[in-house]
Amino acid sequence: MTTPLKKIVIVGGGAGGLEMATQLGHKLGRKKKAKITLVDRNHSHLWKPLLHEVATGSLDEGVDALSYLAHARNHGFQFQLGSVIDIDREAKTITIAELRDEKGELLVPERKIAYDTLVMALGSTSNDFNTPGVKENCIFLDNPHQARRFHQEMLNLFLKYSANLGANGKVNIAIVGGGATGVELSAELHNAVKQLHSYGYKGLTNEALNVTLVEAGERILPALPPRISAAAHNELTKLGVRVLTQTMVTSADEGGLHTKDGEYIEADLMVWAAGIKAPDFLKDIGGLETNRINQLVVEPTLQTTRDPDIYAIGDCASCPRPEGGFVPPRAQAAHQMATCAMNNILAQMNGKPLKNYQYKDHGSLVSLSNFSTVGSLMGNLTRGSMMIEGRIARFVYISLYRMHQIALHGYFKTGLMMLVGSINRVIRPRLKLH
């Protein structure tokens, strides 16, 4: 009698989830040792740290986006389109919501998928902390759709400015949140203005753009060493960005932001990039333990505290560190967690002991568009933290994305993609113009 294949279901096709599905597809799916299924509500994957480039148009997502269906076929796993709305731990099934088109017509009814092992890799969304007016008036940058919306509204503002030759004053853009997204977007906006001017947007120069970056903490990039924060702050100031620290936004309306200090920051376009939380529907889903920002609480093995057959990785997981505190929500952590959880699932299948996840901080890098890149590297060679900037930092920053591509495609295909990217930079506009 044939033993039924073990069913491993991964929910969330972000960096960690997709890398894990790819590797398990190679190790188990292709060899018919297990059935691997990836579930995501989107058709394609785009590395989240690139969203600020999609927002300003310096990256065309059509080139870098990866089709889940095509990738699944090539790497030994299956893909299911849809959003998970429930987990039945007793029956070992997840429920996927029905799919409807833009007209509301039913495409796929609600369905259930059985699992033996479930991995939650749903990432995070921006946390507006229930600040009045934010949802209605600010754009979040959590997915490509939101990035495209920002891009279109940005182009419309610049087009209006160019047509009126600045008769209505400057283009005011406010960004709330001095983390990597806010800092990188602030710099990319100035690069966008420079490129649009070269493509014929009359009167559109750096002087026409007024970017305000608002951070509630004492400094921007609070998760990085102070010297990195200072270097980034200095570079942004040189570009003309107004950086406000220790400034809390209390509400937003159509025309701008209200701060706790009583200042009103006028803005034609507002972005909220302050804080993160796991998706709201995760709160106590399936009776699993969650924290105040909806993250699934996990053991050091990355298994959820109330079910050893359910793992959580990446930003949606609250994982304690032996020295105290929790694993930070960063791309390198998601990558490391994916590898650890995969190895533990394989060990679980073979009756071997599981290993605890240990976060290794390899440093952080922040790209200030074409103007500069700053960051720190950490490791055995440096015996601590070493600050890097300029071309070396830019090379390492780009290498992080290449490592993600290699994990998904291998060296040969990644090399071909780099070649195609080089060709596109020659034949395509430097900025997406529509």
UniProtKB/Swiss-Prot annotation:
Residues annotated for NAD(+) binding in this entry: 176-181, 275
Domain notes: Contains four structural/functional domains: the FAD-binding domain, the NAD(H)-binding domain, the copper-binding domain and the domain of anchorage to the membrane at the C-terminus.
Residues given in the record as FAD binding sites: 12-16, 42, 84, 124, 315, 331
An example molecular function term from Gene Ontology annotations: cupric reductase (NADH) activity
Family: Belongs to the NADH dehydrogenase family.
SUPFAM superfamilies (UniProt xref): FAD/NAD(P)-binding domain
Job of this protein: Alternative, nonproton pumping NADH:quinone oxidoreductase that delivers electrons to the respiratory chain by oxidation of NADH and reduction of quinones. Utilizes NADH exclusively, and electron flow from NADH to ubiquinone does not generate an electrochemical gradient. It may also contribute to copper homeostasis and bacterial oxidative protection. Shows cupric reductase activity, and catalyzes the reduction of Cu(2+) to Cu(+) with NADH as electron donor. Exhibits Cu(2+) reductase activity in the presence of either FAD or quinone, but is unable to reduce Fe(3+). Contains thiolate-bound copper.
Catalysed reaction, written as an equation: a quinone + NADH + H(+) = a quinol + NAD(+); a ubiquinone + NADH + H(+) = a ubiquinol + NAD(+); ubiquinone-8 + NADH + H(+) = ubiquinol-8 + NAD(+); 2 Cu(2+) + NADH = 2 Cu(+) + NAD(+) + H(+)
Segment forming the signal sequence: none
Membrane topology: Peripheral membrane protein
Protein name, per record: Type II NADH:quinone oxidoreductase
Inducing factors: Expression is subject to a complex network of regulatory controls at the transcriptional level. Under anaerobic conditions, is repressed by the global transcriptional regulator FNR, which binds at two sites in the ndh promoter region. Transcription can be activated or repressed by the DNA-binding protein Fis (Nbp): at high concentrations, during early-exponential phase, Fis represses ndh transcription by binding to at least three sites in the ndb promoter, whereas at low concentrations Fis activates ndh expression by binding solely to the far upstream high-affinity site.
Keyword field: Cell inner membrane, Cell membrane, Electron transport, FAD, Flavoprotein, Membrane, NAD, Oxidoreductase, Transport, Ubiquinone
The keyword Transferase is assigned to this record: no
Enzyme class: oxidoreductase
Cofactor(s) needed: FAD
Note: Activity in vitro is generally measured with ubiquinone-1 as the electron acceptor. The physiological electron acceptor is probably ubiquinone-8.
UniProt source species: Escherichia coli (strain K12)
